[in-house]
């Protein structure tokens, strides 16, 4: 097991279970929470290395919680695990301080590579997002450029 400490945040118990199973024996899960306010409290108290969280959560969404944590000096790296594929969410996530963006349907294939990349301060974006952006535009895109090594 690697010594990296991970805090999970998602309001869907099935997602928490799936992520826990994927990470079992590989990383230390220090806590799991189901809303943005609890995320802020536990991240401040437990000082994890990595946050794996959803965007859409009650009380405070993941993007707002990430902005708050970064503002108060949290050193935790952030990976969003979400169903949101549109560019506005992606840009907001990275603007808030995320380094990773994994689509929930690709959780089983993308989460571990995303964690490895993000823990090395690299950016990771699920491939379907990159493919869609490439289809829309023939010119280089900042999101595509950041994720090019993950295609």
State what each model feature region is.
Residues 41, 63-75:
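Short amphipathic alpha-helix used as the core "switch/output" element in two-component signaling
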Residues 9-10, 33, 51:
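Conserved sequence signature across two-component system core domains
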Residues 35-38, 60-64:
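Acidic catalytic/metal-coordinating carboxylates
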Residues 54, 82:
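Active-site residues of response regulator receiver
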Residues 13-31:
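Two-component/phosphorelay signaling modules centered on CheY-like receiver
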Residues 46-52:
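Active-site beta3 strand of CheY-like receiver
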Residues 57:
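Receiver (REC) domain active-site loop signature in two-component systems and cognate sites
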Residues 90-94, 99, 105-150:
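Short, flexible helix-to-coil linker/hinge segments that flank and couple to helix-turn-helix
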């Amino acid at each position: 097991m690697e010594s990296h400490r991970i805090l999970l945040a998602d309001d869907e118990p099935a997602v928490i279970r799936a992520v826990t199973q994927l990470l079992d024996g590989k990383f230390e899960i220090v806590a799991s929470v189901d809303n943005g306010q609890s995320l802020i409290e536990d991240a401040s108290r437990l000082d994890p290395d990595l946050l794996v969280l959803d965007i859409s959560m009650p009380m405070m969404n993941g993007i707002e919680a990430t902005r708050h944590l970064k503002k108060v000096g949290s050193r935790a790296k952030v990976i969003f695990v979400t169903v949101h594929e549109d560019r506005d969410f992606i840009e907001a996530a990275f603007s808030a301080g995320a380094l990773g963006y994994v689509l929930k349907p690709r959780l089983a294939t993308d989460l571990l590579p995303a964690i490895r990349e993000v823990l090395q301060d690299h950016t990771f974006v699920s491939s379907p997002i990159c493919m869609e952006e490439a289809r829309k535009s023939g010119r280089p895109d900042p999101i595509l450029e950041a994720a090019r090594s993950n295609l």
